[in-house]
């Protein structure tokens, strides 16, 4: 059986009626090419089914057009949304994303990182599990490849980082509750080993102190991201502290579980803090990585830092690095937006 002829750049040039160098300029996105010529070349590429050899392009032009992305856990909504935002933004710039899984504990991170560098990517984004950031940065510097970290907390120094402002988000939620009349506000969720939780609890505590409200350590409860455990935890919390009128929840899962727990206990969730004790109502507030339009219609006030927007910011930052618009490291902190309960 005859083998299909491989379409070359010469075939594209002949079909478009231009020189090979013109086709090369269109493929690389460099040089001054008229719109009409570019459209003619791209039409020929599509008609012939020409597949660009990115490795050869890298040798000719110094860039592959590929950005590596190592994700800690693709099953987590945060990283899935971040990946979607990053990919969409980079593809709009004519780039492709090479996606790899680094492991929840970063056990495969170094091996995956080396693989991307050896593949000749233009840059690498690492989302989560960045404990060995110094080693990775040195490896990237040796090959003059930019690396940017996407983090949920501020534990990285002297590297390019894009992360949410956890303290500001906690301050937004807590102050909103206080201004709605709440004075007895508890915290539910997260593990003490989590840096993200530490920053959020710090913002919560700082806001209580700012308004002269007491901090009760026994009102700050750990809880895994389980609706069942959250429901049980809030039920026990309110049984021992019935005058608590509001609870700040670590994430969407905790908030949903807390809401179910309130319903099961015969209590209600709402917004205002006035006369909450007598009405047996409790206001819920929580952090979310989702976009406002995807939030469930339950009575919860949200501090939203959409992971998809973090991905878009990462893409913009990476383009600045690989086009040399900006070379020094930056820590980009994305503020949260408040979405009041309906």
Swiss-Prot record:
Name-wise, this protein is: Maltose regulon regulatory protein MalI
According to its UniProt entry, the function of this protein is described as: Repressor for the malX and malY genes. Also regulates its own expression. Binds maltose as an inducer.
Q: Which gene specifies this protein's sequence? A: malI
Of the GO CC terms on this record, one is: protein-DNA complex
Could you tell me which residue ranges the HTH lacI-type domain spans?
A: 7-61
Q: Name one GO molecular function term.
A: DNA-binding transcription factor activity
Q: Tell me the DNA-binding residue spans.
A: 9-28
- Taxonomy-wise, where does this protein's organism fall, top ranks first? Bacteria, Pseudomonadati, Pseudomonadota, Gammaproteobacteria, Enterobacterales
**InterPro entries in the record:** HTH_LacI (IPR000843), Lambda_DNA-bd_dom_sf (IPR010982), Peripla_BP/Lac1_sug-bd_dom (IPR001761), Peripla_BP_I (IPR028082)
One Pfam short name: LacI
Q: Carries keyword DNA-binding?
A: yes
Specify the superkingdom.
Bacteria
Biological processes per GO annotation: negative regulation of DNA-templated transcription; regulation of DNA-templated transcription
Going by the UniProt record, its keywords in alphabetical order are: DNA-binding, Repressor, Transcription, Transcription regulation
What the entry lists under SUPFAM superfamilies is as follows: lambda repressor-like DNA-binding domains (SSF47413), Periplasmic binding protein-like I (SSF53822)
